[in-house]
UniProtKB/Swiss-Prot annotation:
One Pfam family cited in the UniProt record for this chain: KH_dom-like
Entries under SUPFAM superfamilies matching the protein: P-loop containing nucleoside triphosphate hydrolases
Name of this protein: GTPase Der
Lineage, broadest ranks: Bacteria, Pseudomonadati, Pseudomonadota, Alphaproteobacteria, Rickettsiales
Function: GTPase that plays an essential role in the late steps of ribosome biogenesis.
Alphabetized UniProt keyword annotations: GTP-binding, Nucleotide-binding, Repeat, Ribosome biogenesis
Length: 447
């Protein structure tokens, strides 16, 4: 038995994302008092009382003739078509506005079970005739922010979705905890959402020529070559000095937090905007967090054929110069809008994910260590004593982390550590991932 789907619909700033967060078991949506914060439909597992369901938050709709408005309507329409129940939300403080009436008619034409939710009712609330004129037979007053009225909402939901069909027990979590989480990150307008839509072959995410359309990290569960993958689209990351609006600061914080919990990060770069310091800053942040990374240059179809070879040479030079800590990182050149080379990106993610999880036996590590340190020993110190790295072991994966035992670890230079790391990459075929070394002093400094 599958979980029922409940879709939240309403004009901007009526509290849909607040209710989404209130009912969500898992990830939270960004909440801000600026209308239109949510621009894509978002999914989460929801629960109210004993009833568990799949909850969809939709963009706030208003009368808007431009292309952005049309795309928002398309997102909401898809969410309504998926729904078993629609929760149509209005603002109890402002009362019924013209946009509420238009949207009410829009929802009713789909002839699906629906509940009118009047939000922001912190005090006792009486429905007047304007609410009845919207044409919904079920109404409930709540305060999503304070959690009041949820018992009444539960009763209305159960009335619309018969208990024997909708309430589930002992159902496995459909979102596996061990899936490969791939975050798509980069500067605004690099084509992150277009890339994900092309992969899943669905206009799941809002796209367009406007920079900064994506404002929240959006999760999409997907299967690729029998692998359970969670694709996470993030808001574009600009330099801190150029972020002025509080909403964009929230979006940037959400994107950075998504990187922290990723397995692999796809860094999307616009081929028409030369590699900038911000791209390198994002890549460095990914590496510092210990994530594996795949670099993707999008809009490759817009680069002149006569310029592509020189472009690639310069690009590889910049990456190798500024990101030596992930030497050999995969770089792919794609056109998301034309679906050119997009599957190669997923193949690269799967490959580097396996490397990121690599475990090397202690015997092989120390065989390699002895050979490498003998080939290039550390210099003699004062008094003729030599710093030695005697032994090593792998302490963790994701990323591969190693503990090395030395008679004088504080004398091991950064350049010698880079030598060891780069040699290890080649010896154990570990390109493009962060490798971490920690040094420990042996008990006998003369050994």
């Amino acid at each position: 038995m599958t979980k029922k789907i409940i879709t939240l619909v309403g004009r901007p700033n009526v509290g849909k994302s607040t209710l989404f967060n209130r009912l969500s078991i898992r990830k939270k949506a960004i909440v801000h008092d600026l209308p239109g914060v949510t621009r894509d439909r978002k999914y989460t597992e929801g629960k109210i009382g004993s009833f568990e369901f799949l909850l969809i938050d939709t963009p706030g709709l208003e009368e808007n003739p431009d292309s952005m408005g049309e795309r928002l309507i398309e997102q909401t329409t898809k969410a309504i078509l998926e729904a078993d129940l629609i929760c149509f939300m209005v603002d109890g403080r402002s009362g019924i506005l013209p946009d509420d009436k238009l949207l009410g008619s829009f929802v009713r034409k789909y002839n699906k079970p629906a509940i009118l939710i009047v939000n922001k009712c912190e005090k006792a609330f009486d429905f007047d005739k304007e609410y009845y004129k919207l044409g919904f037979d079920s109404m409930v007053a709540i305060s999503a922010e304070h959690g009041t009225g949820l018992i009444d909402l539960y009763d209305e939901i159960i009335a619309k979705l018969p208990e024997e069909e909708s309430i589930e027990t002992n159902i496995a979590d459909p979102i596996k905890r061990d899936c490969l989480q791939i975050v798509v990150s980069g500067r605004p307008n690099a084509g992150k959402s277009t890339f994900i839509n092309a992969l899943i072959n669905d206009e799941r995410l809002l796209t367009g020529p406007e920079a900064g359309i994506t404002r929240e990290s959006i999760e999409i569960d997907w299967q690729y070559k029998n692998n359970h993958i969670k694709l996470i689209d993030t808001a574009g990351l600009r330099k801190k000095s150029t972020i002025t609006e509080s909403l964009e600061k929230l979006s940037a914080s959400d994107a950075i937090n998504s990187i922290k919990f990723a397995n692999t990060v796809i860094l999307m770069i616009d081929a028409l905007a030369p590699l900038k310091q911000q791209d390198l800053n994002i890549a460095s942040h990914v590496v510092n967090e210990g994530r594996s990374i795949v670099i993707v240059v999008n809009k490759w179809d817009l680069v002149k054929e006569s310029e592509k070879e020189a472009f690639q040479e310069e690009f590889y030079y910049q990456i190798n110069t500024h990101l030596p800590q992930v030497k050999g990182v995969p770089v792919l050149f794609i056109s998301a809008i034309n679906k050119q080379n997009i599957e190669q990106v997923l193949d690269a993610c799967l490959k580097i994910y396996k490397i990121w999880n690599k475990k090397i036996t202690t015997s092989k590590l120390n065989e390699w260590l002895n050979f490498t340190t003998e080939a290039h020993p550390l210099p003699l110190q004062k008094g003729g004593k030599r710093v030695r790295v005697k032994y090593m072991t792998q302490t963790k994966t994701r990323p591969p982390t190693f503990k090395l035992f030395s008679n004088n670890p504080e004398k091991i230079t950064d350049s010698y550590t880079r030598y060891l790391v780069n040699n290890m990459r080649e010896a154990f075929d570990m390109p493009g991932i962060p490798i971490r070394f920690t040094y420990v002093k042996t008990k006998n400094p003369y050994v």
